[in-house]
Amino acid sequence: MPTVRLFTCFLQLLTGLVLPAVPTTQWALSPGNISSEVEVVPFQQVWSRSYCRPVERLVDIVSEYPSEMEHLFSPSCVSLMRCTGCCSDESMHCVPLETANVTMQLMKYRSLDQPFFVEMSFSQHVRCECKPLWEKMKQTRCGDTISQR
């Protein structure tokens, strides 16, 4: 087990050296930005940023590949585009209209085994739309998915 911890620390250190530093963002009322005026975000911008659309999300690899629970991956999550956001009315929800597969190279290993590179495919959401919630409920009954024909 100490070997795995050492290897994980090594990967984190290596990642920190390779990736550029991300600048921190200041909030409107942070101590470094004291002002009596508060910027108001216009409605159109608020609407466009909150409406149903694909947004970058960090997704755990094991949640996409539950059969791989006995393995460790580096990184343990990947960045994918996923549908999220609000719809024009409460009876609707945001769902993918179009998806595409993306293949990523990851490092895979078991506790004492030598790590190796693998290529894994993930589904990304390309286009999203708002659909009625009743369509979602119609497809599931008592937690079991009904197959679509």
Swiss-Prot record:
Q: What Gene Ontology biological process does one annotation of this record name?
A: vascular endothelial growth factor receptor signaling pathway
For this UniProt entry, what is the primary localization, expressed as one broad class?
A: secreted
Q: What is its subcellular localisation?
A: Secreted
Q: What would be one Gene Ontology cellular-component term for the protein?
A: membrane
- Tree of life domain: Eukaryota
Give the keywords, sorted. Angiogenesis, Developmental protein, Differentiation, Disulfide bond, Glycoprotein, Growth factor, Mitogen, Secreted, Signal
Report a single Gene Ontology molecular function: chemoattractant activity
Signal peptide location in the record? 1-18
Name any one Pfam family assigned in the record. PDGF
Provide the residues annotated with a glycan attachment (glycosylation).
Answer: N33, N101
Q: Which InterPro entries match?
A: Cystine-knot_cytokine (IPR029034), PD_growth_factor_CS (IPR023581), PDGF/VEGF_dom (IPR000072), PDGF/VEGF_growth_factor (IPR050507)
Spell out the disulfide connections.
C52-C94, C83-C128, C87-C130
Assembly and partners are described as: Antiparallel homodimer; disulfide-linked. Also found as heterodimer with VEGFA/VEGF.
Query: Which family is annotated?
Result: Belongs to the PDGF/VEGF growth factor family.
According to its UniProt entry, the function of this protein is described as: Growth factor active in angiogenesis and endothelial cell growth, stimulating their proliferation and migration. It binds to the receptor FLT1/VEGFR-1. Also promotes cell tumor growth.
Q: What's this protein's name?
A: Placenta growth factor
Q: Which gene encodes it?
A: PGF
